[in-house]
Design a protein with these regions (language model features):
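Histidine-anchored nucleotide/phosphate-binding helix
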Residues: 117-130
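Short, flexible loop segments at boundaries between secondary-structure elements
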Residues: 135-149
């Protein structure tokens, strides 16, 4: 599918040790529980994609010949990072919108993990920033935490994000 795109941006979770989104950072808390942070409610995740570990590496079979940018997310220890456009505090921008606009890109296709978190936040932020947005459903995978997948699709649809399949790429 990557061959259908002239411009590809890859996001890479790049968490710090002891990241604020990790359940292990809060004694007595469990994975998928929540806690309050300065910017709102935070879902607590298992430790994952810690900088410099194999878990944080891009998969060796990922073939993206036209990838031009790898955008690392999660390196701010106190703020989670779901969206490729802004951190979970809704204040700290990643610079991706400017990067895309400078290149004249007006349409964004979103794939990856997890549909109901990073994909959804990225897609909705892209719409908010004026991009036409498609989520390629069969190129995503959800966590579906307590109905989060259905809620994410509903929110994305309400914001004008279009839901397609990889076979629809030629007609999008």
């Amino acid at each position: 599918m990557a061959g259908a795109f002239e411009n590809i941006v890859v996001t890479q979770d790049w968490q710090t040790q002891g990241h604020a989104s990790f359940a292990t950072s809060y004694p007595g808390k469990k994975v998928f529980e929540t806690t309050k942070l300065s910017y709102g409610t935070q879902v607590l995740w298992p430790d994952h994609c810690v900088q410099g570990t194999d878990d944080a590496s891009l998969h060796k079979d990922l073939k993206l010949p036209t990838a031009q940018l790898i955008l690392r997310k999660g390196y701010h220890k106190a703020v989670d990072s779901y969206s490729a456009f802004e951190e979970a505090d809704h204040k700290t921008l990643t610079g991706l919108a400017g990067y895309l606009k400078q290149r004249g890109i007006k349409t964004v296709f979103v794939t990856g993990l997890a549909t109901d978190f990073c994909v959804a936040w990225t897609a909705m932020d892209a719409r908010k920033l004026g991009f036409e947005v498609y989520v390629i459903e069969d190129a995503t995978r959800a966590i579906d935490l307590n109905g989060s997948l259905a809620a994410a699709w509903k929110q994305m649809s309400a914001k004008g994000v279009k839901r397609i399949q990889s076979g629809d790429i030629a007609s999008a």
